[in-house]
Regions:
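Feature for soluble, non-membrane regions of globular proteins
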Residues: 1-191
């Protein structure tokens, strides 16, 4: 199976002023594409040659896992955002966040802290556990909750390439801007 760079669900400049077109040109067009290219090279002639990204994440290790997970993680991340979104969730998602975290404000603070305090590169995730509870996790590097059987709901990419052109070393500023882009309808659809 040849993996391809999926089309972004919006134009490269659509997330401005929060994420610049220049950042997306590099983040999506260079970094995400490189993970796809590297994955295809690595799986050729292996047991993973015809595997889905999900199977690669659950079963592979090393470079195949790293590149496969990064392809999946980035696609998931792009689909967490939409131009002119943000605000707060409503309905079932809002109720579940209150049940699990006390309030939306508490959830937002805990998720932001997890994203800001992750040492080095990686991802902050909101995941649904097998018992139905929602938890916030930190995954270093290419970490992905599918590997441990969790169900991803939301992610924030905290690799420096996600924000360095716009925010330099100010990761918390990038995280604050991230909240202005969240597509709560898409996120709620993952419950």
């Amino acid at each position: 199976m040849i993996h391809e760079l999926p089309k972004l669900p919006y134009a490269l400049n659509a997330l401005e002023p929060y994420i610049s077109e220049r950042t997306l040109e590099f983040h999506y067009g260079k970094h995400h594409q490189a993970y796809v290219t590297n994955l295809n090279k690595l799986i050729t002639g292996t047991e993973y040659e015809n595997s889905s990204l999900e199977d690669i994440i659950r079963k592979a290790g090393g470079g195949i896992f790293n590149n496969g997970a990064q392809v999946w993680n980035h696609t998931f991340y792009w689909n967490c955002m939409k131009p002119k979104r943000g605000g707060e969730p409503t309905g079932k998602l809002a109720d579940i966040l209150v049940k699990n975290f006390g309030s939306f404000a508490e959830f937002k603070e805990k998720f932001s802290t997890a994203a800001a305090t992750l040492f080095g590169s990686g991802w902050a995730w909101l995941v649904k556990k097998s018992d139905g509870s929602l938890v916030i996790t930190q995954e270093s590097n290419a970490g992905n909750p599918l590997k441990t059987g969790d169900h991803p709901i939301l992610t924030c990419d905290v690799w420096e390439h996600a924000y360095y052109l716009d925010k330099q070393n100010l990761r918390p500023g990038y995280i604050a801007d991230f909240w202005n882009l969240l597509d709560w309808d898409a996120i709620a659809g993952r419950l």
